[in-house]
Amino acid sequence: MLAISRFRVAPDRAVDFVERARAAAAFFASRPGCVAADLLQNLDDPQLWTLTSRWADVGSYRRSFSGYDAKLVLVPLLSEAIDEPSAYADPAEVGENLPRSLS
């Protein structure tokens, strides 16, 4: 399972963002089931960043959000992410992927 959270970060906020995003990547990396967690910057648009993590399974990813430390490190940062779907899995694991109802 792959989780990709993208961020648009103004240059004057980059230093603070990188510090918080590195802490989030380290937090993810310390959680059971996390295969890798990386903070990456776009090659063409320096204001575009991603926090990308790979997980053994979706359950491990979801459990990484449990607990007080997760609320302190992950939630404030991820609330700044671009609002778009962020979780991906092998199509065989996903099955028929139907959009959620907006009503």
Language-model regions, residue ranges each:
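Short, flexible segments with low predicted structural confidence
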Residues: 1, 15-16, 32-33
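Short, well-ordered beta-strand segments in beta-rich or mixed alpha/beta enzyme
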Residues: 2-7, 38-65
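Short, surface-exposed ligand-recognition loops at beta-strand->loop->(often short) alpha-helix junctions
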Residues: 8-19
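Intrinsically disordered, low-complexity segments enriched in polar/charged residues with Gly/Pro
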Residues: 13-15, 26-27, 39-41, 74
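Residue-level signal for secondary-structure boundary sites
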Residues: 13-15, 59-61, 93
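An amphipathic, aromatic/His-enriched active-site/gating alpha helix that lines ligand/cofactor pockets
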Residues: 26-35, 54-87
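Glycine-rich beta-strand-turn "strand-cap" elements at beta-sheet edges
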Residues: 38-47, 73-103
